[in-house]
């Protein structure tokens, strides 16, 4: 945690500077009252509702004692729960066991379902975000009854029937969205339909329902958990999808094909009986747009997931490059080609433009300011049907991305490590901007900077009086509930950036990028010198 210290300085004379300084001071005071242990417990609880976290941000001090007691109680309860397993667990000499590929260096024997016996079903329901069930043996799908059967061997006792229910989606705490996810029944049976299709590799079963259609949720709730759950199979796995969508495969097929060598199965649409030697039903998830390497085989991290994106989009990006090069050749535009070559040396900035709420009203001025600083600027306005490879191509080649808080910020995953990500943070969205994009961006190795607007940079400033609570105290407004937050700060607000103030951020980003480039050029030169020396000696 960053420790903040009070500074004594001369009072500024400009009203704008005073407003900015007051906002910074308020942020410092908020950080000063946070307790690390409380913050950890608070963060977990508030994943249940965005507004719940923000609304209770101001009540942390009064609730500190209660939350500490609650945290201590939870710790003792967990210790009592797992103590018998740790101290008295023994392995039966005659038991045939199958480990679901745990990490080689972890204590996976202490985790639920880290070891799954043959002809058994084990469900891990201990995680806050998701349930995951494991089936080992003769596994058969039965779409008509929304079931997956595990055929028990004839030697198995008749009273060992297991029937588990699961909704394979990674937002377990959100009852409203989980109610829309198809529920599967996982059952042990003595007899089942014959196999129509026999697979020699495992199945991973998950839903592409819920919030699918929003790019943040497609990556956070779907693709990253799919990577976490399946990457250790080295593509020798079949994906079985509930609520299968052709458009989803069209959009994400490049990534899915890097995780599986087999075509996916539409669980509801394919009524044949598919048989597998094992199945994982549900997906693991760690945190927002990130991967906990300590929980992964071979310490895979979000950087490894990004490398997979490189591999997935590279063929399509090369095809787009060839098409554009061919078009340039056909147009015979020598002047355009000359301009492109000259612009390649300038640091590139991509501005993610919004057309609805939270739009930058003076976007043209922002572009001109960035160009004046020295950037080559590209403005993108991604739509739901925008090809991801084209967005990847733009962001993978840029040095800086600028955008207002929203789902499109998920595309920071396409940026190269050590690139700069500037997120414009509207009023009332501080926590969400940091939680969902700021922290994950730093984990990916990006240079993250939050540009928190002042009240006068919000369109709400023109709608309400300057002393209105909506402008002066967004936390108390957010405390009224999610619908109020959504209406006021997410759907009802645009931004008009103070160009003079924002230019300082642009200058810092430009200086960082140019220094980084010089270091890279120096390193390349140092690597070339020994080679040239060897050639001379020859």
Spans of model-derived segments:
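The feature primarily captures lumenal catalytic ectodomains
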Residues: 2-22, 27-538
């Amino acid at each position: 945690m960053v420790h903040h210290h009070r500074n004594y300085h001369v009072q500024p004379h400009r009203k704008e500077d005073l407003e900015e300084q007051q906002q910074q001071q308020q942020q410092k005071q908020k950080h000063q009252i946070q307790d690390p242990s409380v913050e950890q417990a608070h963060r977990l609880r508030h994943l249940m509702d965005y507004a719940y976290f923000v609304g209770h941000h101001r009540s942390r001090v009064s609730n500190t004692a209660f939350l500490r007691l609650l945290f201590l109680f939870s710790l003792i309860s967990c210790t009592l729960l797992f103590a018998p397993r740790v101290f008295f667990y023994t392995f039966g000499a005659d038991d045939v066991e199958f480990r679901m590929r745990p990490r080689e260096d972890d204590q996976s024997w202490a985790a639920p379902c880290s070891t799954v016996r043959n002809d058994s079903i084990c469900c891990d329901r201990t995680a806050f975000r998701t349930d995951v069930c494991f089936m080992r043996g003769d596994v058969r799908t039965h779409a008509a009854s929304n079931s997956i059967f595990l055929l028990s061997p004839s030697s198995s006792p008749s009273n060992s029937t297991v029937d588990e229910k699961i909704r394979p989606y990674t937002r377990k705490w959100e009852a409203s969205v989980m109610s829309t996810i198809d529920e599967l029944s996982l059952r042990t049976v003595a007899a089942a339909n014959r196999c129509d299709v026999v697979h020699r590799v495992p199945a991973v079963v998950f839903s592409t329902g819920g919030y699918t259609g929003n790019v943040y949720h497609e990556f956070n709730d779907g693709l990253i958990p799919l990577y976490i759950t399946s990457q250790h199979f080295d593509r020798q796995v079949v994906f079985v999808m509930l609520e299968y969508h052709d458009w989803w495969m069209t959009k994400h097929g490049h990534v899915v094909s890097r995780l599986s060598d087999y075509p996916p199965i539409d669980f509801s649409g394919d009524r044949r009986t598919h048989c597998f030697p094992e199945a994982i039903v549900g997906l693991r998830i760690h945190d927002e747009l990130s991967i906990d390497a300590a929980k992964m085989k071979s310490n895979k991290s979000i950087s490894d997931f990004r490398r997979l994106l490189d591999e997935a989009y590279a063929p399509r990006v090369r095809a787009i490059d060839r098409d554009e090069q061919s078009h340039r050749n056909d147009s015979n535009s020598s002047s355009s080609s000359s301009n492109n070559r000259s612009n390649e040396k300038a640091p590139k900035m991509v501005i993610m433009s919004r057309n609805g709420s939270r739009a930058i009203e003076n976007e043209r001025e922002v572009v001109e300011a960035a160009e004046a600083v020295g950037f080559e600027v590209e403005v993108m306005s991604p739509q739901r049907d925008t090809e991801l490879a084209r967005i990847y191509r733009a962001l993978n080649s840029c040095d800086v991305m600028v955008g207002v808080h929203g789902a499109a910020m998920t595309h920071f995953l396409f940026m190269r490590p050590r690139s700069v990500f500037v997120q414009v943070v509207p009023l009332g969205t501080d926590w969400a901007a940091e939680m969902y994009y700021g922290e994950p961006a730093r984990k990916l190795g990006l240079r993250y900077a939050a540009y928190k607007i002042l009240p006068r940079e919000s369109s709400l400033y023109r709608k309400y009086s300057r002393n209105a609570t909506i402008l002066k105290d967004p936390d108390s407004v957010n405390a009224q509930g999610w619908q109020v937050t959504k209406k006021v700060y997410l759907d009802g607000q645009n931004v008009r950036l103070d160009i003079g103030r924002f230019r300082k951020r642009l200058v810092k980003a430009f200086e960082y990028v140019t220094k980084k480039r010089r270091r890279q050029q120096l390193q390349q030169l140092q690597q070339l010198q020994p080679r040239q020396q060897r050639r001379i000696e020859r």
